[in-house]
Curated annotation (Swiss-Prot):
One of its GO terms (biological process) is chromosome segregation. Pfam families: F-box_4 (PF15966), zf-TRAF_2 (PF15965). The keyword Zinc-finger applies. PROSITE patterns: FBOX, ZF_TRAF. Part of a SCF (SKP1-cullin-F-box) protein ligase complex. Interacts with SKP1, CUL1 and RBX1/ROC1. Changing residue 8 to C: In a colorectal cancer sample; somatic mutation. Substrate-recognition component of the SCF (SKP1-CUL1-F-box protein)-type E3 ubiquitin ligase complex. Required for muscle atrophy following denervation. This is F-box only protein 30. It comes from Homo sapiens (Human). Keywords: Metal-binding, Ubl conjugation, Ubl conjugation pathway, Zinc, Zinc-finger.
């Protein structure tokens, strides 16, 4: 409180027994707290005391989040535990794999009797599948909306700079809606890169002319002494450069050798250890050639102090001179190979097959057997990369290759070998997600062979176009336009019936990497703060952890299609059981109902008697409903309008309030998020289960006696053991089977 509103004496006075007489402008009388909290203070400090009085009624700390209660200040901490606006979101996660094509048939059998038999693991898996399909549908709609907003901007920028040119193949514009913008943007980018490349080539050509005009006096004497051998090596280098194309393949077009080449300014500078001279090897498109023969010849030139500047072209490698001479001896090339490959690593010091120039032919290349035993070791440059034996093969001189889009139909495998014809869209979509996972079969299998990636086609079944037509991984399964283009044999059943996810829950920590095809599900349910601890313990700690065979035990022959299961555990009260509600997406506890109460309920359904519960006074119904948990209140509110009003009167004391936000746009163009409304609802928490007991049920062995899938296969024909497969003379002596099976030492 400001000092001018208080007296000069009262500002610093804190004594309960102050004896100062009240004087105008100096002091005032002592008073006690009107709420009888025990505080005594000067009357001018009454407003200041209200800010600290523990009995002063204040709104809840969560009043901005929707809590309507006001209480004494000393009760705020106690109220926060049951505050309807103190809401906690459960962030528990679990993972599931899509069902592989090998297990598809067995899961179809398990999903056959879902509505008749209540199974916890199946109910949770179907709930996860519905959440997955709904989330993918929302993601698809969001992506389509984004594309519609960004599409006009792209068309405006492209049409302003790129003229419309008719296609050379005589076709009309290729699907302007889907491919026009992408095609025109590609043309625009290509033109921009071409203009930038012309500027770069012009600048680098001028720099190259200045560099080549400077004489190199240090290399003139040595070049004169060994001019004959250098000329032979240069001619050999030119011969190789004329044969090699721009990407390392053979250039069969001899008519383009005199074409004008543009320098790109890239060079590969190699320093010789002996003569300290410099040499620039040929490059194509700014990258060094991967031809081992050219590298060996360049090293041999460095040994003799040759300084040569090769043409650096932006297309095919063009020879620097048109003269031809006899190829150099294969012995010099073998000497270079001797340094790269030690003779100890080869059998008898001999390279069996090496690509060598033919001395007797007309400059042609052939395979020769070269002996490296008598060749002297000379100093050459060592390679820093890992040793590879690719140069021993003829990969450099193979036929030119090209990238081509292929389909799995090129494998010439029988159509639909896995029997997937007629599956529904949901199963096919989840199979599509299973592509790169260890549990599925990918479209292609990527392998590595000596630094080369090889993709081997493995998938031999086709997927419906309704899945691949969308922009998400699985796609919008409920899209009518996509289903129209799908295979007519594919059906589209309700997602509540067919299970396409694995029943087994996988627990992977957040910090651990997950497979791309593994789906992660979050609980995401909202609870009051006092209900969260029991929910996490009972649902995630007890129920989820026991669904893999401990709480919900399935028949051992479930893989073959048996749908029988039994619940081994029940809450502490014998007869109560765990149930799952599909609409609430939550588990709950169904208490044991006496048969005395069940019979009148059946008669009420048949209309033989009136509903006695609805005839009770509203206050009595309100009192009875106060003993129910959130899960039961949600169920009761769906019975009738009267019960809905009864449950609605308990929302402030038993429910929770959730804020719904909405985006508000202003006339200026900006927008902001504001609270649209406050929604009251009950949580799905059930009463806490502190103890679990074994249910009073029959053993699984009793079911196996009458299981229709437990077919005993009787073998009447004797099958000899491996140790008994000997001649009859050894067994005619009457020896026992144990002596026959005794190992022979």
């Amino acid at each position: 409180m400001e000092e001018e509103l208080q007296h000069s004496h009262c500002v610093n006075c804190v004594s309960r027994r102050c004896m100062t007489r009240p004087e105008p402008g100096i002091s005032c009388d002592l008073i006690g707290c009107p709420l009888v909290c025990g505080a005594v203070f000067h009357s001018c400090k009454a407003d200041e005391h209200r800010l600290l009085c523990p009995f002063e009624r204040v709104p809840c700390l969560n009043s901005d989040f929707g809590c309507p209660f006001t209480m004494a200040r000393n009760k705020v901490a106690e109220h926060l535990e049951m505050c309807p606006a103190s809401v906690v979101c459960c962030t528990m996660e679990w993972n599931r794999w899509p069902v592989s094509y090998a297990d598809r048939k067995s899961y179809e059998n398990l999903s056959r009797d879902v509505d008749e038999v209540a199974q916890l693991d199946m109910a949770l898996a179907l709930q996860d599948q519905r959440m997955l399909l709904e989330s993918l549908k929302v993601a698809t709609m969001m992506s389509k909306a984004t594309d519609k907003v960004s599409k006009p901007r792209e068309q405006i920028s492209v049409k302003s700079s790129v003229p419309e040119i008719p296609h050379a193949n005589g076709l009309v514009s290729v699907d302007e809606e889907s491919y026009g913008a992408l095609y025109q943007a590609t043309v625009e980018t290509t033109r921009s890169l071409a203009a930038a490349l012309d500027i770069l080539n012009t600048a680098t050509r001028d720099i190259g002319m200045l560099n080549t005009s400077v004489p190199n006096d240090m290399d003139e004497q040595q070049n004169a002494r060994e001019s004959l051998e250098d000329q032979n090596l240069k001619d050999q280098d030119h011969l190789y450069e004329e044969e090699i194309g721009a990407v390392g393949g053979i250039d069969y077009n001899d008519t383009n050798q005199n074409a004008q080449s543009e320098q790109n300014g890239s060079s590969d500078l190699l320093c010789d250890l002996n003569t300290s001279s410099y040499d620039t090897s040929a490059l194509c498109n700014g990258f060094p050639l991967e031809n081992i023969c050219t590298q060996v010849i360049d090293q041999n030139q460095n040994l003799h102090g040759d300084s040569k500047q090769s043409n650096l072209t932006n297309g095919d490698c063009v020879a620097s001179s048109d003269g031809t001479s006899k190829p150099s001896s294969s012995l010099a090339v073998a000497a270079q190979l001797r340094e790269i490959i030690p003779s100890s690593a080869l059998p008898n010091g001999t390279v069996q097959h090496i690509l060598m120039p033919d001395d007797e032919g007309e400059g042609e290349l052939c395979w020769k057997k070269v002996d490296l035993g008598d060749v002297k070791n000379v100093d050459v440059l060592s390679f820093s990369h890992a040793p590879s034996f690719n140069f021993l093969s003829n990969s450099c001189w193979s036929k030119p290759k090209e990238d081509k889009a292929v389909d799995t139909s090129d494998l010439e495998v029988a159509e639909d070998p896995m029997g997937l014809q007629g599956i529904d869209l949901i199963t096919a979509a989840l199979l599509f997600c299973l592509g790169d996972s260890p549990g599925g079969r990918g479209i292609s299998d990527s392998r590595m062979a000596d630094i080369y990636h090889i993709d081997v086609g493995t998938q031999t079944f086709s997927l419906p176009s309704a899945i691949l037509a969308t922009s998400t991984m699985v796609g919008e399964i409920a899209s009518a336009s996509a289903c129209d283009h799908a295979n007519p044999q594919l059906s589209n059943p309700s997602p509540f019936q067919t299970l396409g996810l694995d029943l087994v829950l996988e627990c992977v920590a957040r910090y651990q990497p997950k497979q791309r095809s593994m789906f992660t599900f979050v609980c995401g349910q909202l609870f009051r703060r006092k209900e969260f601890s029991s929910h996490f313990k009972n649902v995630h700690g007890d129920i989820h952890a026991g669904l893999n065979g401990w709480m919900e035990q399935r028949c051992p022959l479930a893989y073959y299609g048996c749908t029988y299961s039994q619940r081994r555990f029940c809450p502490s009260i014998q007869g109560a059981k765990i149930i799952h509600d599909r609409h609430l997406r939550s588990f709950g506890v169904q208490p044991c109902v006496s048969t005395v109460l069940v019979e009148p309920a059946r008669n009420c359904v048949l209309g033989l008697h009136n509903d006695h519960l609805s005839s009770l006074p509203f206050e009595v119904l309100q009192h009875i409903a106060g003993f129910l948990d959130g899960f039961s209140l949600c169920q009761l509110s769906c019975v009738s309008k009267l019960m809905r009003d009864v449950c609605g009167s308990l929302l402030q004391s038993r429910g929770m309030v959730i804020l719904q936000w909405g985006k508000r746009k202003y006339p200026e163009g900006n927008s902001s998020w504001q609270i649209k409304e406050k929604v009251w609802r009950f949580s799905t928490a059930f009463c806490s289960v502190n103890e679990w007991k074994f249910a009073d049920i029959l053993s699984m062995a009793d079911h196996l006696k009458k299981c229709s899938y437990n077919v005993v296969e009787k073998r009447e024909e004797a099958i000899p053991l491996p140790c008994m497969c000997v001649t009859r003379e050894l067994t005619k002596e009457g020896r026992s089977l144990r002596s026959v099976l005794k190992p022979v030492l």
